[in-house]
Swiss-Prot record:
Pfam families linked to this entry: Phage_cap_E (PF03864)
Function comment: Assembles to form an icosahedral capsid with a T=7 symmetry. The icosahedral capsid is about 60 nm in diameter and composed of 415 major capsid proteins. The assembly is primed by the interaction between capsid assembly protease and portal dodecamer, and major capsid proteins assemble cooperatively to form the procapsid with the help of capsid scaffolding protein. Major capsid protein forms hexons and pentons of the icosahedron. Viral genomic DNA is packaged into the procapsid through the portal vertex. The packaging triggers a dramatic reconfiguration of the capsid shell.
Subunit structure and binding partners: Homomultimer.
Superkingdom of this protein's organism: Viruses
Keywords associated with the record: Capsid protein, Coiled coil, Host cytoplasm, Late protein, Virion
Family: Belongs to the lambda phage major capsid protein family.
GO cellular component: host cell cytoplasm; viral capsid
Disulfide-linked positions: none
HAMAP family documented for this protein: CAPSID_LAMBDA
Protein's name in the database: Major capsid protein
Coiled coil: 109-129
Predominant localisation class: virion
């Protein structure tokens, strides 16, 4: 038995629970939900000839011999779920005034909305993780419930994934005399387009700014009306806009996700990513595989939230949001990923 309508849940989800990580916001602005279980690249404008290399993963290893190129595939399915425990409605909520206690009906509503906030955050973390991996390496492993892990390879050129080593390592350079600008310009030549943004993790940024030449060239003045700076404003606590390095924006990203109750950084230590804010990052979604959604005519959607009571002795109430996300890059070579040393 449904408690809130899907329209009500979608409205609450969209208005209350905005989660906007850096890579999704800056690089993945196009959204394509499909009404089929599979995602068809040929149906996305401008991607008629695009195909991905997909390989099954068995016991943690990619089986390339069983892989192949495809332009249609099934995304992993995610559906975080919570139970609305009746006992929780009898306890005072953390922000409740002890002198003005709320009734159980109000608490139940608050618990439902908090559950949905947590479920939305869980899915958004998956989307951002896929987006970051696509930008960093041009491939990632997609997983889902009752879904065999599969590596999705977008075909990034080997020269676009760079690892500093030996004498080329910035850590071995003289911080007073060396200018890393030439290195950056050389790396940028591997990109298929113009580079207008560089994203560092905090440790990568600390290494970059340790050079005297960087401190002299970095323009930290605010007040620019450029489209790029406007796009980088108000990105939250996990993002810091450091200024312009020539005509390239410098951004530091310290975003995290939670895996097995442990906080982990999206960007590995000593990471530098060169890219363009006009790159075509694609948020694609397979259809919602739920009988209730089909009865309501909801097939092509990025999310399907639901709240229902399962009758029985006793009856139990649940919340859940379903999604089948797959983040893709139309051209993975628009980015150059550098592992600093």
């Amino acid at each position: 038995m449904s408690v809130y309508t899907t329209a009500q849940l979608l409205a609450v989800n969209e208005k209350k629970f905005k989660f906007d990580p850096l890579f999704l916001r800056i690089f993945f602005r196009e959204t394509y939900p499909f009404s089929t279980e599979k995602v068809y690249l040929s149906q996305i404008p401008g991607l008629v000839n695009m195909a991905l290399y997909v390989s099954p993963i068995v016991s943690g290893k990619v089986i390339r011999s069983r892989g192949g190129s495809t332009s249609e595939f099934t995304p992993g399915y995610v559906k975080p779920k919570h139970e609305v425990n009746p006992l929780m409605t009898l306890r005072r909520l953390p922000d409740e005034d002890p002198q003005n206690l709320a009734d159980p009906v109000y608490r139940r509503r608050r618990i439902i909305l908090q559950n949905m906030k947590d479920e939305e955050l869980a899915i958004a973390q998956v989307e951002e993780k896929q987006a970051v991996a696509a930008v960093l390496s041009g491939k990632y492993t997609m997983t889902g419930e009752a879904f065999e892990p599969v590596e999705v390879d977008m075909g990034r050129s080997a020269g676009n994934n760079i690892v500093q080593a030996g004498a080329a390592a910035w850590s071995s350079r003289d911080k007073e005399t060396y200018d890393p600008t030439d290195d950056i310009e050389a790396y940028a030549l591997n990109a298929s387009g113009v580079v207008n943004i560089i994203v560092f993790d905090p440790k990568g940024w600390a290494l970059f700014r340790s050079f005297k030449a960087v401190k002299e060239k970095l323009d930290t003045r605010r007040g620019s009306n450029s489209e790029l700076e406007t796009a980088l404003k108000d990105l939250g606590k996990a993002v810091s806009y450091k200024g312009m390095y020539g005509d390239v924006a410098i951004v530091v990203y310290s975003g995290q996700y939670i895996e097995n109750d442990v906080k982990k950084n999206y960007l590995p230590d000593l990471t530098m990513v060169l890219g363009n804010t006009q790159a075509r990052g694609l948020r694609t979604y397979g259809c919602i595989l739920d009988a209730d959604a089909q009865r309501e005519g909801i097939n092509a959607s990025t999310r399907y939230p639901k709240n229902w009571v399962q009758t029985g002795d006793p009856a139990r109430e649940f919340t859940m949001i379903q999604s089948a996300p797959l983040m893709l890059l139309a051209d993975p070579d628009e980015f150059v990923s550098v592992k600093l040393a």
